[in-house]
C-alpha cells in the first residue's frame, strides 16, 4: 500500500502533443515561426494566466532552491513546478480541486492564445515516493493519449470558406492571404518575436533571390539514450526532495549541453560568414531535442558547430555523464511541405541512432537527404529503392564526417561535371563507373581516384548529392579566400 504522506497534494504532468504537426501544418514561413514561439512559451503563458486569475504557481524551479512537499504544503503557493524538460511539465498542486481550476485556466488560455495547441494533463495523489508517482503519471498519460479524442475547436458549415491546409474556417484576409484563427495567432506571435530580433525565415531562405537561393535545411537533433539517463539520475533515491533536486540538475545540465552552448557556438560560427546566407532560426529547443531551420548552404556549418560544442561540454564531464546525439538534415526548396521535410529530417536522425545503438549510444552520427522532386516515400524506402549500396550515410561525426568534408573539398578540383558524371555512372553499373574513373584520372592524376576503393566510391556518391550546396565555390568563398 502506498504511503499517503503527500499532505493532500496531487502531482500533475502536462505534455504537449503533436508539436511538430502544430508548427508545420502550414507552409507559410511566418506562421511556422509563430507556431514555434507559441510552443516554446506555452507553459510561461499558462503561469501568467493563472496569476491573473489569483492562482499562485511558483515556477522558479531553476533557482537551485530545494523542493520539499511539506514546505510547499505550508507555503502560500497553490502550485509549484517540480521540473520541466522535453516538452513535459511536472507540477504539484495543493489539492485536486486546485488542479481542476488550473486546467480550466490553462484550457481557456490555449484556446484564446494558441487556438489548437493540444496538451494532455494527468494527475495522481502525491505519496512519499516520487518514482512511483511518476510511473503512475506516465501510465495515465499513455492511457489518455491512446483513448482521448483529438478535436479542433470549431467545425465548419457548407457555406464557410476554409483554409486549404487545415480546413479551419477563414476569419480574416490579410496581405492577400486567407487566415484562420490559428494562423492569425501564429502571425501575431511571429511579429512579437521579430520585434526582439529573431531572424525572419524569409531572410534565411533568400527570398530576395527566389529561384536561385531558395533552399532551406531542416535540422533535427536528438540526444542519445536520454531516457536511460533520466532513470539513472534517480536510481538509488525515491523521495521527492532528492529526486526533484537530481532531476532539476539533470534538466538544467541537458539544456545547457544540448541547447544553450551549441546555439552560442552556431551563432559564433555563422557570424564569421559574410555572404548573408548563413542564417538560422530555432523552431523547437528544449531538453535534448532541437529543431533548426537554416539556409541549406549553412547546414554543414551548423551541424559541425553543434557537435563541436557538445564535445567541448563532454570534456568536463565524467564518462558515465557524457552526452551524445544524432542529427538529421533534410534539404528542400522553401515551397516544399515543411511537415514532410521535417519527417525526413527526423528519419535521417533515426538512421543515425540505429548505428549509434550498436555502440551503446555513445557515438554521434549525422545523416542527410536532399528532397529534390517531392517527397513520396519515407527515408527507409528511399534508401532501399534508390540508394542501396551507393551511400555511406549516416556518418560518425568525429572521423567519418570530417573525412566526407575533406573528400568533398579535395574532389572539387576535378570539377562539378565530373563529380556528377561519377555519381550517374555508379547507378548505371560498375563498368560505367570504372570507365569514368579512368577517364577522369587521365586528366586529374593527383585527384586520388581509385575504382576499387569502395569507401571512396560511396563518398563520391554522397558528395554529388550536395556538391552544389556545400562544396561548389561561390564568388563570396573565392573573395574570402583571397582576403
Could you tell me what each predicted segment is?
Residues 1-483:
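Regulatory and interdomain segments flanking nucleotide-handling catalytic cores
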Amino acid at each position: 500500500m502506498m504511503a499517503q504522506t503527500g499532505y493532500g497534494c496531487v502531482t500533475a504532468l502536462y505534455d504537449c502533443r503533436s508539436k511538430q504537426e502544430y508548427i508545420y501544418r502550414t507552409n507559410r514561413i511566418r506562421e511556422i515561426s509563430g507556431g514555434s514561439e507559441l510552443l516554446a512559451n506555452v507553459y510561461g503563458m499558462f503561469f501568467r494566466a493563472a496569476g491573473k486569475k489569483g492562482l499562485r504557481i511558483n515556477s522558479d524551479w531553476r533557482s537551485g532552491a530545494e523542493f520539499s512537499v511539506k514546505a510547499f504544503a505550508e507555503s502560500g503557493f497553490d502550485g509549484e513546478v517540480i521540473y520541466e524538460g522535453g516538452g513535459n511539465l511536472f507540477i504539484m498542486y495543493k489539492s485536486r480541486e486546485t488542479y481542476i481550476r488550473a486546467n480550466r485556466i490553462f484550457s481557456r488560455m490555449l484556446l484564446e492564445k494558441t487556438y489548437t495547441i493540444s496538451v494532455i494533463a494527468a494527475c495522481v495523489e502525491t505519496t512519499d515516493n516520487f518514482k512511483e508517482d511518476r510511473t503512475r503519471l506516465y501510465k495515465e498519460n499513455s492511457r489518455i493519449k491512446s483513448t482521448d479524442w483529438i478535436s479542433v475547436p470549431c467545425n465548419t458549415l457548407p457555406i464557410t470558406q476554409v483554409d486549404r491546409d487545415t480546413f479551419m474556417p477563414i476569419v480574416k484576409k490579410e496581405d492577400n492571404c486567407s487566415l484562420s484563427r490559428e494562423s492569425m495567432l501564429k502571425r501575431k506571435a511571429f511579429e512579437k518575436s521579430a520585434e526582439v530580433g529573431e531572424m525572419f525565415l524569409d531572410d534565411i531562405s533568400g527570398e530576395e533571390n527566389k529561384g536561385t537561393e531558395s533552399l532551406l535545411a531542416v535540422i533535427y537533433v536528438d540526444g542519445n539514450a536520454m531516457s536511460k539517463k533520466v532513470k539513472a539520475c534517480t536510481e538509488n533515491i525515491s523521495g521527492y526532495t532528492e529526486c526533484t533536486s537530481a532531476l532539476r540538475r539533470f534538466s538544467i545540465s541537458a539544456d545547457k549541453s544540448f541547447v544553450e552552448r551549441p546555439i552560442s557556438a552556431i551563432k559564433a560560427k555563422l557570424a564569421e560568414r559574410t555572404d548573408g546566407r548563413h542564417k538560422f532560426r530555432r523552431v523547437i529547443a528544449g531538453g535534448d531535442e532541437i529543431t533548426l531551420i537554416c539556409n541549406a548552404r549553412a547546414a554543414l556549418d551548423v551541424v559541425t558547430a553543434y557537435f563541436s560544442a557538445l564535445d567541448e561540454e563532454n570534456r568536463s564531464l565524467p564518462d558515465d555523464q557524457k552526452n551524445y546525439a544524432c542529427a538529421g538534415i533534410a534539404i528542400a526548396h522553401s515551397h516544399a511541405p515543411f511537415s514532410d521535410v521535417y519527417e525526413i529530417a527526423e528519419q535521417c536522425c533515426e538512421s543515425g541512432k540505429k548505428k549509434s545503438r550498436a555502440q551503446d549510444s555513445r557515438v554521434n552520427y549525422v545523416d542527410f537527404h536532399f528532397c529534390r522532386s517531392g517527397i513520396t516515400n519515407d527515408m527507409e524506402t528511399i534508401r532501399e529503392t534508390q540508394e542501396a549500396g551507393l551511400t555511406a550515410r549516416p556518418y560518425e561525426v568525429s572521423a567519418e564526417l570530417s573525412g566526407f568534408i575533406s573528400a568533398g573539398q579535395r574532389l572539387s578540383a576535378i570539377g562539378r561535371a565530373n563529380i556528377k558524371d561519377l555519381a550517374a555512372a555508379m547507378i548505371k553499373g560498375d563498368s560505367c563507373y570504372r570507365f569514368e574513373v579512368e577517364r577522369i584520372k587521365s586528366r586529374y592524376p593527383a585527384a586520388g581516384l581509385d575504382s576499387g576503393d569502395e569507401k571512396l566510391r560511396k563518398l563520391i556518391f554522397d558528395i554529388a548529392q550536395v556538391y552544389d550546396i556545400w562544396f561548389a565555390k561561390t564568388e563570396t568563398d573565392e573573395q574570402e579566400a583571397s582576403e
